[in-house]
């Protein structure tokens, strides 16, 4: 029952097996009862197609050579189609097709019938569908009859290419001179099928109003009982929904808050919900809430739940990034360049092979390294033929990066305090082909005692790890305030030690980079601000064109304004581990004197020794306090007189000259120790040296040690009444003075300005002569620890004098 095949004819429409045999409609007429036009039964798809074809025939008649009066005979119309409907089609055009009694659906265009006509004309066959009384109809009678529903389903399968039928319909309408838009046709169908007063649009409006009411309903904090239930057995979906609601309320707190609720209540509820949903401890979550805004805080917590992408750094000592990328792609690795800021980085999305065990990795062509750990080396910018220190080098990623930037020239000293981690450094440096590195194992805080004078120093200080939570989720709960402060104190010590290791006079360097993988202010800005106060360094730009600026003010703290040049990196904004980078420039190798000796975290080196700077005490204290101090020291002199007597006996000084010893300052152990503790205190009473005056109080307090000659001498030379009788500061000679020998007497008493050199007559050493010799103007004098000494004449001018029967050398 197939049709003839013409190989030159292009096939159109569905296949020939999808069409039904012609003439089935005539058989249906025999089985179906006749119905009137008012109550017409729904036509089959085939009958509708033929009816539409006949209606369109009258429209297309003028363009064809057919007679315009040719109309289908009324007697041959199928049942269900009236002659009036067919006649109106030629008068009103295609719009009458929609007004014909066709049931609920508009008849499809006669695209398939046109194809059937063309096929029948080519095959020379008679279209039995147009002949209702054909003799072949008896041969095609179905024993079981035909069901219109089954015909509709089969015809639907034959009309799958809807676009093709619509295109043909538009072509026919254009040929008839009528232009119809698809929107107008659809609107007419909707008007026929659903009236404007029907229910579905009202239902949609009702749904929309309900949705608006749900959106406008304010959020209400749950009661205490529900909060306790969430703490015991939390419903994560409900907790997450509550987090979103609270964050939305806090953005517009004045308009959306619940009456009688304060902002602190919402914040406390949010903090508890975040701790439950993301499994954070209260301490660390509180630190993060102080650090980020609420909307950014949720993004940061979400980013910590996702691991950072795997990144690797190309070893330019052995290969190029282009060659390495091609080799890894051939092995099934999906990768891309890391970014415009890196010339050697690659980011790996997925891999069919272990990325850490490829032949390229074993050959040292690349190093698995995080993107954030490449930034400190780029900020340091090491140059060729320099001396560089990596104070905390393990596991060797930054050290090898510096070596490849230096092209294996110069010297790199890689130091780490952990001997076990140094093993990985050795392995990586050998694999990557680094040859300019020396590995050391010292405590970084004591490193300036070992070696110094480096051009550049890199300090990747140990920290709490709050920036790498995605790698170590245990940080969420095992950190507290003590851990943060302990790390901060260690970082201060290491940073001062690193600064002392830098050579400020370096022609190409003098730079230091300090970095941590933490985001807390206590470990970053606080430490940097401390170093700016303790050492002669300043902050310089890091050279990185991205990253957020460091804090210059955080809560109650205020930092140096130059901290804006530091850089912060976060996982939710830069898709890398949290990191902090600061770059210093050292401009002097000296240490500020104001910070010397009283720094708790200063590195104990030889440059930290205190310097003794003499300064007059009377310039800073009133005269009354000076007199009181002098009297107190006179009482001490009383108890130390036996030492004075032994000193006189050792140095051959007569008892008559005992009073002159009161004008000589001595440095005791207490005074020496105080000078090292506070350099602002003077070493001795300078004013007492300039104006030595002795009153009768000394003779009354120590009568046993004074001879009768001394008493008479003091009475004769006592100053008149009314003059200044201030007692100078008198201290007993120390043990060091007592051990001095007479041969040291040739050294001068002190290089004070205005000291007159006079020769004394050949007589015993008297008090008046000594006072006249040491009558110096007021002014600061350096401390002295020597006994009575003056300028010594040449040996030829030495004279002898008798004192109590003993020969003694007099100083002229």
UniProtKB/Swiss-Prot annotation:
InterPro entries for this protein: MeTrfase_RsmB-F_NOP2_cat, MeTrfase_RsmB-F_NOP2_dom, NOP2_rpt, Nop2p, RCMT, RCMT_NOP2, RsmB-like_ferredoxin, RsmB/NOL1/NOP2-like_CS
Biased composition (Acidic residues): 111-124, 133-157, 181-192
PTM annotation, UniProt: Citrullinated by PADI4.
Positions of the UniProt region annotated as Interaction with NPM1: 24-56
Reaction it catalyzes: cytidine(4447) in 28S rRNA + S-adenosyl-L-methionine = 5-methylcytidine(4447) in 28S rRNA + S-adenosyl-L-homocysteine + H(+)
Xref: SUPFAM superfamilies: S-adenosyl-L-methionine-dependent methyltransferases
Signal peptide as annotated in the record: none
Pfam families from the UniProt entry: Methyltr_RsmB-F, NOP2_rpt, RsmF-B_ferredox
Entry's Gene Ontology cellular component terms: nucleolus; nucleoplasm; nucleus
Source taxon at top rank: Eukaryota
GO molecular function: RNA binding; rRNA (cytosine-C5-)-methyltransferase activity
Compositional bias per record (Polar residues), positions renumbered to this chain: 591-608, 660-682, 723-739, 803-812
Short sequence motif Nucleolar localization signal: positions: 40-57
Region called Catalytic domain, residue ranges: 371-594
Database matches in NCBIfam families: nop2p
Role noted for this protein: S-adenosyl-L-methionine-dependent methyltransferase that specifically methylates the C(5) position of cytosine 4447 in 28S rRNA. Required for efficient rRNA processing and 60S ribosomal subunit biogenesis. Regulates pre-rRNA processing through non-catalytic complex formation with box C/D snoRNAs and facilitates the recruitment of U3 and U8 snoRNAs to pre-90S ribosomal particles and their stable assembly into snoRNP complexes. May play a role in the regulation of the cell cycle and the increased nucleolar activity that is associated with the cell proliferation.
Subunit and interaction comment: Interacts with MCRS1. Interacts with WDR46. Interacts with RRP1B. Interacts with NPM1. Interacts with NOP56, FBL, RUVBL1 and NUFIP1.
The protein, known as: 28S rRNA (cytosine(4447)-C(5))-methyltransferase
